[in-house]
A protein has these predicted regions:
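Short, structured segments at the rim of ligand-binding sites
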Residues: 1-168
Length: 168
């Protein structure tokens, strides 16, 4: 259910996300390739199967092996990724390989049981000034730490995500 209010938009889920018809990336006004990884991550626990077809970049699925380590059911064949929704994801230590894939790992971590640690935050910080803070405003439990004592732009910082209390 979607309702507009003076202070924002309220979304209420009536249950599990459902798989969507094939997601095909395309130049504007088509589905943006930059959104593909995050949407894929959001659908990891959906009911059904979603097919992603990457028509812009040849090598856009660097995040998939990390998602699979968390229990995602994803099969890759060239530019096609087939995502079968699973009941649950398991927390893991994962590595962001790029900006969009890193954001996808954070989203997956919020769905997983346990504490997920996402390494190599410098990729994520290139495009999101404060992703942990922004998601915390939505109720996410995210902690960022610098494990090597370097500057804030050091690639060593990590983000730990905890699923919300209501996650199943």
């Amino acid at each position: 259910t979607l309702s507009c209010r003076e202070d924002g938009i309220r979304l209420v889920s009536d249950g599990c996300l459902r798989a969507v018809s094939p997601v095909r990336t395309a130049p504007y006004p088509g589905f943006p390739t930059d959104a593909q990884a995050v949407v894929m991550s959001a659908l990891l626990r959906s009911s059904g199967t979603t097919v992603f077809v990457e028509n812009i970049f040849e090598s856009r699925y660097h995040h998939v092996p990390e998602l699979v380590r968390m229990g995602a059911d994803i099969r890759l064949e060239g530019r096609v990724a087939v995502v079968c929704g699973v009941d649950r994801l398991q927390a893991a230590r994962v590595r962001a390989m790029d900006l969009r894939g890193g954001a996808a790992l954070v989203i997956a971590g919020l769905q997983a049981r346990g504490i997920t640690t996402v390494e190599h935050l410098h990729h994520i910080r290139r495009g999101y000034s404060d992703l942990p803070g922004d998601l915390a405003l939505l109720g996410a439990c995210i902690h960022t730490e610098n494990t090597e004592g370097g500057a804030s732009d050091d690639p060593a910082p990590q983000t730990q995500t905890h699923p919300p209390e209501t996650a199943g």
